[in-house]
């Protein structure tokens, strides 16, 4: 489910941004015909469509830095943790922000957490996710495969696991469930190249499935409120059914990306803007801005450069956040906010990670373009950067640090920070007492 894309920054850029005393300001706005917002005349004049089902607050189903499923309620973090590196067994853990403790999500006295009698025990965590709805925790099949569970289970720490919904036959095999709201889970399997697709809505609480048609080459890349943000390729001529690579390249040379809002309840789309197909690498949507890489120069040379741009939906202009980024030096992934997306609350910082160094973490300020290094903490006598993981309802940041010499996804130490101290290279406000298997 990881859909990250690379953005490249140099060491000099990092040093300049991190040492800057005053935040850098974005470059002046520029408007391009290909980046213009849709005018009212371009929108459909048809009567409003009737919603076919309720849509709540859409979220991308979150993962942590290791690709493991997590869920942040603002008061606690729920996650699946491998019980052993030798077996597929896993445990559902809860990190309580107020109590500063991580524990197995089980309240049965004397439970050894090693069988299905334990509410938190999973014989296998392959293709399993965790979510919380209305204060209740569930596990669900993250991808519909032969090794995935066939049920959604309600987890009661006092009594055990209860199956509440079976995977319906109407959902296609191997589809990933990537988004959710208060009512349903959503998935959109990959369609054949240049062919229409289908978005599936599984209302697991009422045992129904709805389908929403997707346009050719259309993909969901983000969500806000009750709408999905989509991107699709639009060309001046149809793609041949069995065209050669050269034919396709010739068509794509004059194609554009179309960004639009999709209302899943009605199927209606609202066009936002278009960008040249050559400008790719969508990175994030934040505060009415679509961030992507563009303005490629010196293509296919060691000196190739690009810019980090954003389209501002508030005024219909494209702006440059970072310019002159050499593409052969530093790789930084800025596709998603540090997971699990602050329980759905937007933040101005992106978690970024330098290529080739699992411990080098930074933040990108999406308002100023500053790149800030993660502060280092001493955990068990070892200095490691504090990797951002979640945000609490009280506004503190939860971080993870791994003091092991070799990267061990089963082992991390959590801490809570005041954001100002984190950004000032300070120290955490408190450490979390982690669960340790007996």
What is the meaning of each model-derived region?
Residues 19-22:
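Bacterial signal peptide processing site
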Residues 15-17:
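C-terminal motif of bacterial Sec signal peptides marking the signal peptidase cleavage site
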Residues 68-86, 127-145, 178-192, 225-250, ...:
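Short beta-strand elements that form the blades of beta-propeller/WD-repeat-like
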Residues 60-73, 114-131, 171-182, 214-226, ...:
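Repeated scaffold domains used in trafficking and secretory/extracellular systems
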Residues 45-61, 87-115, 147-167, 192-214, ...:
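Surface-exposed loop/turn elements that mediate protein-protein interactions on large endomembrane-trafficking
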Residues 1-9:
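Positively charged n-region of N-terminal signal peptides that target proteins for export
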Residues 32, 91-92, 397:
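PLP-dependent class I/II
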Residues 30-68, 72:
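N-terminal low-complexity, Pro/Thr/Ser-rich intrinsically disordered segments
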């Amino acid at each position: 489910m990881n859909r990250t894309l690379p953005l490249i920054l140099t060491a000099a850029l990092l040093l300049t941004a991190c040492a800057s005393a005053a935040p850098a300001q974005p470059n002046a706005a520029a408007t391009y015909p290909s980046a213009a917002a849709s005018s009212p005349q371009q929108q459909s004049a048809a009567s409003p469509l009737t919603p076919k089902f309720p849509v709540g607050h859409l979220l991308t189903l979150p993962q942590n830095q290791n690709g493991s499923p997590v869920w942040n309620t603002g008061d606690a973090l729920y996650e699946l943790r491998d019980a052993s590196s030798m077996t597929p067994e896993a445990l559902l853990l809860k990190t309580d922000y107020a109590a500063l403790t991580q524990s197995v999500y089980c309240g049965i006295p004397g439970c050894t957490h090693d069988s299905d009698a334990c509410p938190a025990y999973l014989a296998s965590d392959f293709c399993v996710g965790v979510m919380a709805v209305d204060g209740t925790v569930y596990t669900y099949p993250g991808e519909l495969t032969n090794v995935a569970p066939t049920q959604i289970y309600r987890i009661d720490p006092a009594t055990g696991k209860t199956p509440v919904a079976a995977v319906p036959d109407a959902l296609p095999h191997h589809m990933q469930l990537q988004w959710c709201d208060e009512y349903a889970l959503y998935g959109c399997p990959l369609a054949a190249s240049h062919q229409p697709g289908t978005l599936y809505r599984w209302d697991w609480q009422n045992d129904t499935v709805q389908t929403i048609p997707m346009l050719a080459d259309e993909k969901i890349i983000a969500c806000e409120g009750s709408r999905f943000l989509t991107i699709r390729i639009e060309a001046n001529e149809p793609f041949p059914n069995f065209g050669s690579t050269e034919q396709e390249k010739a068509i794509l040379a004059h194609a554009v990306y179309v960004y639009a809002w999709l209302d899943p309840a009605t199927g209606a789309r609202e066009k936002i803007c278009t960008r040249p197909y050559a400008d790719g690498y969508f990175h994030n949507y934040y505060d009415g801005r679509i961030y992507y890489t563009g303005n490629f120069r010196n293509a296919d040379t060691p000196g190739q450069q690009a810019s980090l741009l954003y389209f501002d939906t508030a005024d219909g202009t494209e702006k440059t956040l970072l310019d002159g980024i050499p593409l052969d030096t530093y790789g930084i992934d800025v596709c998603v906010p540090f997971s699990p997306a602050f329980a759905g609350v937007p933040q101005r910082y992106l978690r970024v990670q330098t290529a080739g160094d699992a411990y080098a973490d930074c933040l990108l300020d999406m308002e100023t373009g500053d790149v800030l290094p993660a502060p280092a903490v001493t955990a068990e006598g070892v200095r490691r950067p504090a990797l951002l993981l979640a945000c609490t309802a009280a506004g503190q940041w939860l971080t993870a640090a791994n003091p092991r010499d070799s990267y061990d996804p089963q082992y991390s130490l959590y801490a809570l920070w005041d954001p100002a101290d984190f950004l000032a290279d300070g120290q955490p406000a408190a450490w979390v007492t982690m669960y340790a298997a007996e």
